[in-house]
Amino acid sequence: MKELTSSEVRQMFLDFFASKGHEIVPSKNLIPQDDPTLLWINSGVATLKKYFDGSVIPKNPRITNAQKAIRTNDIENVGKTARHHTLFEMMGNFSVGDYFKAEVIPWAWELLTSPEWYGLDKDLLYVTVYPKDQEAKKIWLEKTDLPEGHIYEVEDNFWDIGEGPSGPDSEIFFDRGPAFQNLPDNDPEMYPGGENERYLEIWNIVFSQFNHLPGLTDNAQYPELPHKNIDTGMGLERLVSVFQNGRTNFDTDLFLPIIRATEKMSPDYTYDATKDSESNTSFKVIADHIRAITFAIGDGALPANEGRGYVIRRLLRRAVLHGQKLGIQGEFLTKLVPIVAEIMQSYYPEIADNTEKIQKTIAAEEKRFNATLTGGLSLLNDVIAKAKASGQQVISGADAFKLSDTYGFPLELTQEQAADEGLTVDVVGFNDALQAQRTRARAARSNDKSMGVQNAVLTDLKVPSDYVGWSETEVSNAAIVAIIGHDNQGVDALLANAEPGDSVQLVFDKTPFYAEMGGQVADQGEVLNKQGEVVARVTDTQSAPNGQHVHTVEVVTSFKLGDQVALKVNLARHVAISKNHTATHLLDQTLRNVIGGDVHQAGSLVEPEYLRFDFTHEGPVSEQNLEKIETMVNQVIANNLPITWVETDIESAKKMGAVAVFGEKYGDVVRVVSIGDFNKEFDGGTHAQTTAELGLFKIVSESGIGAGVRRIEAVTGLAALSQFKAEEQALKVIADSLKAQKLTDAPAKVEDLQVEIKTLQRHLTSVEAQLANAAAQDVFKDVKTQNGYQYITAQLQVSGMDGLRQVVDTWRENYPSDVLVLATHVDDKVSLIVAASPEANKKGFKAGDLIKAIAPKIGGGGGGRPDMAQAGGKNPAGINDAFSAVSTFLDELA
């Protein structure tokens, strides 16, 4: 049999079908485009649905691809079975109303057996067909040289996922030989198509020839499709394992380089393909998950708490936990990204091009999880231990929620860890705790939006209402066309009138009040009667399902449906909001000018007091760039550029060069706002008339709010001036305390002070080292013996882990014992270190194993190398228990 690399296997498949007139379609983005039914592209045909449902006619009805895909429904099986993956590649050939069985079956056989192509031994290939599909069986037997005894009829060979196209299929299996047989010969599953390891399914060819109509349950009743299709799927990972004789898919060039790189970072474990062990599972999980994480982030997905971002976060945290099981400390996943890029370079060069961006995103997420990991593992271990000690089989929902809410452990990870210990998790209790938190959060919000839940009254409301706020902030003759409140039973209803003290929602036939949209908060103001008296105060304005602006008001004097009223927007507030909205456009454009192409708007909030702008960018924006951005925005303000807008169709807007917000959906007609020649964007908000109206722009803060997302908060006008003055006053206070003659002298004074502090710190470190060494001489005299090991345990008064390491260095000068265990605590933070002599290591002692055994006593966790390991915790009272556990551990060593 040929020995082929994964790249050769993939390319040979595509080349073969290209020779049969197929168009090679590149692998599409993992994030589905215009398909809300999918979280991820999860099959080879998923990106071609538009062709098979008839909504788009392909230029060439013959298509072939090798499509990356993600599935996580069987994530708990990854690493434990030979072939479960989260990211995989599906190779396929497709016919959209063109060829059918008579063509595809001989082609499949040619690709598999021809020496020019894969060249597999035909005697090792088996085929299954649907019993009623005698047509396919006949073609297999007459148009190929498949041995007659190698074809089986199987009832399951009918592809049907509900209403729509369906049909029989042929599955092709490769006989891996007796070495892979895991069942006796007489087992009912020991046949091609059965649940066994010997006969490996390598290809499925679906003959889509029937239409599953609503109400039909028997496929014999399905009518024939007028245009029959072919849909095939061949898993790259499976076929590569055949050509490389891999025991599992992981034992191939798609995974082994990742596993070998992970081995180098594990101090205690190596990968052995011939064994089924927990460590082997961890190696496989890491290799699988880093591939999925790398590709998903490369395609634009980011870790988050919901949707596909949650999938990435769960995969990453799952991989980190398996790294812990292998004794890997610190951030390690980023080091594997270049390995993935190198493996996939031939077909996915974009991974190598985006390696730095992918690594930054992973590093930020890994660091965030590692910050809480020790505490989370400690809590989880305690919870499991308590459950077992009390004879319980279930971890409470409250404990699982605390792990999720406080330590970032997704529920599924807690379930997996519990399952490993023979326990389950109270999911109902978890959901109750989650819902209770959400209820508390909603109650705590001071600005609940009345339109958060659309009621039936608003859904059915069809009365017309025009927004005139682009040119007016006051209307003298508006009619009340709807009053929405509660009836006597407290149910939402249309009312005929409103009385003082009521809180109701009003709809007018025309309104100047801007409804909250696109991050810009709503207008507020007043409703007046003909006499100019205030009858209601507008506190919020939202858009109803049918487009009307719905005004939440506090009623001052009574009014009724149909009354003519005047509407008056709070002008000062409206102007402040409009200026800040213009400032967000200036900031957006300037960020792209200064930082570059990876900046895209990720959200915004425009209030009268300040503006907030979220954008994609890896890592903090430097102080130098923040200064450039602030200066450039203020220069544009000083240039007094005109601000204009126009409504046009979306294609014309794109031709104008207008920038759209990524992920936003736009209608056929869009509004384009232009700020001179500086900026042009799709936008539906209100703005200043010229940039000079903003007066001044000041950045207040820049921070990270998630992996790959940054946030800038800023102010304009008098608020910006106040911010400058406040910072100047703070600098004056600092200058006075440093006795600086001028404000400009303060930085030099601070530098002098920093030099002095560093000098004192060095002196303090030296004194601490002397004290630690002095204490060490007494400690080293107290040597105990257990099971042939001499060991020392001691609690020292030093400043944390650095102080303990200094004592270890002194101990290593002459090794007065085989093992050294030291602890210290500052307030409630405990540091624990274990060191081993070379002789102890030769006898089989590993510091990392001991630290894992005793760290829970101090309420923490840790790990390290065989010669030295460390841990942190939050339970100083457990130090003596940890020391007592040392002798027990040594006594149990062989």
Curated annotation (Swiss-Prot):
- What InterPro entries does the record tag this protein with? aa-tRNA-synth_II/BPL/LPL (IPR045864), Ala-tRNA-lgiase_IIc (IPR002318), Ala-tRNA-ligase_IIc_anticod-bd (IPR018162), Ala-tRNA-synth_IIc_core (IPR018165), Ala-tRNA-synth_IIc_N (IPR018164), Ala-tRNA_ligase (IPR050058), Ala_tRNA_ligase_euk/bac (IPR023033), DHHA1_dom (IPR003156)
Catalytic activity line of the entry: tRNA(Ala) + L-alanine + ATP = L-alanyl-tRNA(Ala) + AMP + diphosphate
GO-annotated cellular components: cytosol
Enzyme class comes to ligase
UniProt keyword Ribosomal protein, yes or no: no
UniProt keyword Nucleus, yes or no? no
Domain of life here? Bacteria
Q: Per its UniProt record, what Gene3D superfamilies does this chain match?
A: 2.40.30.130, 3.10.310.40, 3.30.54.20, 6.10.250.550, Bira Bifunctional Protein, Domain 2, Threonyl-trna Synthetase, Chain A, domain 2
Entry-linked Pfam families: DHHA1, tRNA-synt_2c, tRNA_SAD
The EC number on file is 6.1.1.7
> What NCBIfam families does the record point to?
alaS
Tell me which HAMAP family the record gives. Answer: Ala_tRNA_synth_B (MF_00036_B)
Family listed: Belongs to the class-II aminoacyl-tRNA synthetase family.
Q: What is known of its domains?
A: Consists of three domains; the N-terminal catalytic domain, the editing domain and the C-terminal C-Ala domain. The editing domain removes incorrectly charged amino acids, while the C-Ala domain, along with tRNA(Ala), serves as a bridge to cooperatively bring together the editing and aminoacylation centers thus stimulating deacylation of misacylated tRNAs.
Any idea what this protein is called?
A: Alanine--tRNA ligase
